[in-house]
């Protein structure tokens, strides 16, 4: 890039520059560590403020250019003279919200060559956010862009000066010699030495196990097992904070309201999900205690819904609360949006999409089955391969768990087929939530919750619609695990008490599906498995590396939201434990599922083949043919997967012209080695890891990472409120067993089936908490970046990469039109269902708010 341009600068020439930054007071909500602080201060005086822009002038901030072409006596790029910000640029068309621009001039001459990096020092007490530096008027070279997006603290906090590189792209072996030292030094700086408690201003990326979920110092009931680092509880790694161990358990880390993040992983942009995320924290710290007092201390309102109409009242008239309670939870702006107070002491939720057209469509068997293909958890259903379904649990410990569903249960409804013929024709399907819960079921049922392990068998009719034929509810044998399971089989019914029993049977299935969705499909398979990639990438791939530039948009805000989850959602006594059936065992159970996690099966085509939902077919797009043609998640997902993979292929081919070049890339090989051996270290000996020896290995790995962080997360996250906002449709816990004939509960089921259903599923208090959380999780921020978008048009100087990226964006726009046309095809019944709710979750674009569409680049909420 810089070869052949040395000597083109006139001696004594001044290089003109523009620095864009953001003051802390317009940006940084993260300086407030408690929601109470947010509520008490309001959003007009966030953090320590810099009163005005003139504070940046004088000798407050210095910059020093580094040559990319001229070395000093030690071989390092020559340093220019330090210079300071000169004046405020009052108007600049490219400035974003909250950004300020400053003029700067650098003394430079032909002995210095071409700038390729710069140092910056902040001499003020308050940090600021550096957005970019642009150098103009470089003879015969044009402009040089430095995309920074980083917090700059007072220089005393840094042993090594903060450095930024121009937006060129280099493999390690192609780095201009004068920049090699600086490139390696910056990576070493980001890795740290693995010791000590991390400080707010640090940018160190390191690994740790999940040892901060519990609080053993508060008692045995508050302790949680350490996840990761053992054969019993394998888990992906999280970011290391270095907090002190707890007093009672040296293996557990003490908890605090402040959770260290590498500073640039905390939201560093004007992002409404700052408010969404702190809204999540507010639900945990403010809303939960306030509502607990309403339901359990004041007895202001009963904790049971009386009828389905009362549930619908949450969206119509709202729920009345005492005035003082409202005043505790509504001042935070995001909560004002979520809890629509009407001035009459009521909280009101927006109506979820699942009831916007039909209030009763959710109750139908067709919708129950359709949501397995187009709902919020569409990647669990399998094509039935053997009958009866068998368990993979160790029979030496758990006995025989073979399904009790028989041919007699199924064949009357197979349209003349035998079970064997239906399996051969790929007409039978299974939603299996048996093995994941059974080892914990005895413990779960010893609390106030009552649940079953479930298996659901469905039939694909000639209209491509699934219909449930049988549901098996299983309990551990009362005489001990080794005796197997006690199972009950239920079949569809349309009227009488049998229809009420059938609705309850479906509810037990959905409770299991809700837990599996939240803890596995959502948390584990997107949030948790991606975090090690974020850490490894920052530790081993320089920002000059092409693969860093490819992947970094797909990491935006992920470590931040994950740290918040450990603080308020998946921790001991957190919102997940309070509102979901798995309770205190939630994270532990997700660890058991991670035992069977296979990285290469996270590619959508491989996942579909594994579940029997597709067969290999070289003549079909993505090399697979779907077993269910009208499978909205899979049909749309394969389109998105193909576009992602094509973009990755196009990009990778620009920099790796041979497999040998990839094998010799020291940063890439160190990145992959550490990702496998440390980041996912509990799986390091698995044979299925790509060896990172070929370009195809790299393309597949990057495609899986981008797919997981973008489209997969979008599919399992942004429909949560649209489907689960109606607790009747997606209950999160069950509190009673199926009523037995002759019991009072059975009589209630006969006389008041709605009341019996409501007494079985999630009660009112947990419902309000659940709805509050999933409404926040389902929202898009105002400045969300979607697939095909970047935060800066100058993210690379490589015009070939920019052209390939433009092609990627155009393809995504084309596919969105295609998906819209598909949703208008009335023959594709699974795209709407009885609730008349088009499947839009994989539309690439979206506006702000609750939209039920849009694929953000990253796991940012």
From Swiss-Prot:
Its cofactor is Fe cation. It catalyses: (9Z,12Z)-octadecadienoate + O2 = (9S)-hydroperoxy-(10E,12Z)-octadecadienoate. It comes from Pisum sativum (Garden pea). Keywords: Cytoplasm, Dioxygenase, Fatty acid biosynthesis, Fatty acid metabolism, Iron, Lipid biosynthesis, Lipid metabolism, Metal-binding, Oxidoreductase, Oxylipin biosynthesis. Residues 247-257 have a biased composition (Basic and acidic residues). The gene is LOX1.3. Its EC number is 1.13.11.58. GO terms for cellular component: cytoplasm. This is Seed linoleate 9S-lipoxygenase-3. The lineage of its organism: Eukaryota, Viridiplantae, Streptophyta, Embryophyta, Tracheophyta.
